[in-house]
């Protein structure tokens, strides 16, 4: 079944018109609305919500907090974007879907790579070799053709700035 989330999100925008000037905030409403609908259906049908996020998205923070990572199980969460494409192709997913330009669909013309400032192949390689792997910045630039220090620093910054998205919210320790 296809459930249209736009009318639901529009109700939120009408309730808080002062916030509708922020495109990112509005896009996040769509993503969080989708999560609410997913859980509503899952609860009603005694099911679980499966995620579609990958390691590149998780590590760079390219997801909406309490939105597209609000899932019960994320079977491809440990795979880099390249690995997800390879898996999809090996399972016979049509090439037009495998090669489709990644987008969160938050607004017209939006693409993941434009927002990240790097293509996924570069992000995956930097994550695998430098962030998750043993190579220094210098060794990574020497290993990856066309990758420079600024691109590595961009990925490092994305990882650092999104740490809060990969952690439970802070809470005070219990009183002794």
Place the predicted regions along the sequence by residue.
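ATP/NTP-dependent adenylation/nucleotidyl-transfer catalytic domains that generate, transfer
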Residues: 1-14, 18-48, 52-55, 62-176
């Amino acid at each position: 079944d296809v459930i249209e989330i736009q009318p639901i999100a529009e109700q939120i925008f009408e309730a808080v018109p002062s916030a509708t000037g922020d495109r990112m905030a509005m896009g996040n409403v769509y993503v969080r609305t989708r999560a609410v609908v997913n859980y509503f259906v899952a609860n009603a049908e005694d099911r679980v919500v499966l995620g579609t996020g990958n390691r590149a998205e998780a590590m760079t923070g390219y997801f909406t907090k309490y939105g597209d990572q609000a899932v019960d199980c994320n079977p491809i969460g440990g795979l880099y974007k390249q690995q997800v494409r390879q898996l999809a192709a090996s399972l016979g997913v049509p090439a037009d879907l495998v090669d489709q330009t990644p987008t969160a669909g938050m607004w017209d013309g939006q693409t993941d790579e434009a927002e990240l400032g790097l293509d996924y192949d570069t992000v995956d390689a930097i994550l695998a070799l430098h962030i998750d792997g043993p190579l220094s910045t210098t060794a990574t630039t020497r290993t990856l053709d066309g990758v420079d220090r600024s691109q590595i620093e961009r990925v490092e910054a994305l990882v650092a700035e999104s740490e809060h998205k990969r952690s439970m919210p802070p809470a005070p320790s219990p009183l002794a």
